[in-house]
Amino acid sequence: MNRCLFALLLTAILLTACGSSSTASETTESGIEVHQIKMGAGAQGEDRALYLAMHNHGSETDQLIGASSGAADVVQLQNGTEIVEVIPVYANTEFVFIPDGYHVMLIGLKQELHVGDEIEVVLQFRDHEDLTIRVPVGEATEHEH
């Protein structure tokens, strides 16, 4: 009985550790690291928010000026529901995208995205090179709009 309970507990812990956010990180050559990448599953034509954390390891402030993806008709930078032209990426600082705050919005998914799928999104910076990130698709959240 104890072995079965232990095996069930261990399985639950391992499954929890394999959640929908990416533990991998992507980094530009000049030091902007992107990690904690997550986005929910969705049907074709729906919109989905992409959340992540950006850490600028450099000594100069930069700006995220755009994003693109072949997985959606339109990709926008947003703060809440408002479109923004830039998101500051301050030097030696980490910035976390959150629901109802800054995020990347994928509008009009071109195909249904299931839990476990992965898409690519290109982040465009004012002063750094573009960064292509791999986005794991997880469970949809109540914050999708």
Residue ranges of each PLM-predicted region?
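Bacterial N-terminal signal peptides that target proteins for export
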Residues: 1-6
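C-terminal motif of bacterial Sec signal peptides marking the signal peptidase cleavage site
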Residues: 14-17
